[in-house]
């Protein structure tokens, strides 16, 4: 599979990006680079700065870690460009046209817009280079909460109530009655709980819409769902098998400043705990795993996804799907598969091999 002199597969780890999840992407990339088997893989780091410049990436994974609550960023180095020509697939060139490196496969560790939303997947599809994770359609649909829910609902999967705001800031009285209080106001295309507000009084609604709209012109307003927060990973093997991890139960998510699982609570404050496997009865566990796989298939995902649920008194309700979940040391996706018997290094190996063996 490799044309490298070492005989190893060359993996371009692309990270950073223009989204508000830039720093999380950097930490995920550092963990991935540290865990890719050096006997099988050569890592080619490619960073994308917050203003969108593609640059030679950091070679030391330790520099892409969370240190004293300080999140890393891609620094400006010598710029590189990916080739879009299938005759030169996998090549990255410096500004003067000279070759930086040639990759056999791309691992786009990009969270949020301009990376997890199908844009980068489409870019690399132009040159026929294998890419880890879902393709253009699944990535775009998974990034947009409106269309995620529409596709899930069309497949008969359980989703909550929501209203979409495109060019308005107010809800009608009928919509307020439909949703009730509290509601969550979110950017329709975002992640890591950035730009999200929990609204308990309608007089605070406009401010919440303004915050969400700072990250996305389209806003989704969701009814609060009372239940336990449970996550489940999905992994596709090179032979096409799709498996679900043991689920994880999150506790302490309400301790964020806004009363929910916000960015600081996820990555900085160290107050959320996860029970893996989740202490659920066998029937509920199997149902969550089944729904996770069905969600993966409903969006035509490939490779991987993390599916988030609320487990209510009436059963599980799908919250969202992440087509490139976090790979940080505290991220649920690798932890859930480790608890399922798939170690971090093996997980990465499966993902890279799945990308190389699929029909691109």
From Swiss-Prot:
Residue positions binding Mg(2+) 2: 320, 322
Transmembrane regions listed in the UniProt entry: none
Q: Which reaction does it catalyse?
A: 2 D-alanine + ATP = D-alanyl-D-alanine + ADP + phosphate + H(+)
GO BP terms: namely: cell wall organization; peptidoglycan biosynthetic process; regulation of cell shape
Query: Which EC number(s) are documented for this chain?
Result: 6.3.2.4
Q: Does the keyword Ligase apply?
A: yes
Record-linked PANTHER family: D-ALANINE--D-ALANINE LIGASE (PTHR23132), D-ALANINE--D-ALANINE LIGASE A (PTHR23132:SF25)
Q: What is this protein called?
A: D-alanine--D-alanine ligase
**Gene name of the encoded protein:** ddl
């Amino acid at each position: 599979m490799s044309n490298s002199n070492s005989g190893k597969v060359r993996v371009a780890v692309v990270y950073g990006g223009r989204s508000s999840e830039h720093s999380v992407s950097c930490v995920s990339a550092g963990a991935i680079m540290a865990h890719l088997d050096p006997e099988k893989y050569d890592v080619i780091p490619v960073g994308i700065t917050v203003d969108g410049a593609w640059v030679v990436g950091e070679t030391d994974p330790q520099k892409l870690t969370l240190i004293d609550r300080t999140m890393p960023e891609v620094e400006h180095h010598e710029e590189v460009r990916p080739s879009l020509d299938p005759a030169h697939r996998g090549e990255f060139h410096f500004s003067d046209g000279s070759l930086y490196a040639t990759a056999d496969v791309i691992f786009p560790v990009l969270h949020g817009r301009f990376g997890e939303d199908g844009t980068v997947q489409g870019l690399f599809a132009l040159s026929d280079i294998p890419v880890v994770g879902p393709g253009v359609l699944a990535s775009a649909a998974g990034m947009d909460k409106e269309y995620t829910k529409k596709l899930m609902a069309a497949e008969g999967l359980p989703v909550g109530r929501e209203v979409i705001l495109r060019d308005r800031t107010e809800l009608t009285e009928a919509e307020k009655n439909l949703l009730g209080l509290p509601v969550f106001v979110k950017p329709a295309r975002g992640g890591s709980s950035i730009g999200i507000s929990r609204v308990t009084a309608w007089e605070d609604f406009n401010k919440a819409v303004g915050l969400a709209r700072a990250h996305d012109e389209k806003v989704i307003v969701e009814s609060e769902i009372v239940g336990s927060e449970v996550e489940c990973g999905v992994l596709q093997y090179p032979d096409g098998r799709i498996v679900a991890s043991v689920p994880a139960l999150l506790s302490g998510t309400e301790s964020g400043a806004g009363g929910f699982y916000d960015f600081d609570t996820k990555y900085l404050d160290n107050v959320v705990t996860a029970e893996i496997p989740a202490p659920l009865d066998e029937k509920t566990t199997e149902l969550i795993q089944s729904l996770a796989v069905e969600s993966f298939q409903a969006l035509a995902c490939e490779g991987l996804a993390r599916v988030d649920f609320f487990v209510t008194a009436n059963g599980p309700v799908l919250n969202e799907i992440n087509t490139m979940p976090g790979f940080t040391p505290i991220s649920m996706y690798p932890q859930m598969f480790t608890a399922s018997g798939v170690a971090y290094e093996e997980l990465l190996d499966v993902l890279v091999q799945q990308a190389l063996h699929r029909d691109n």
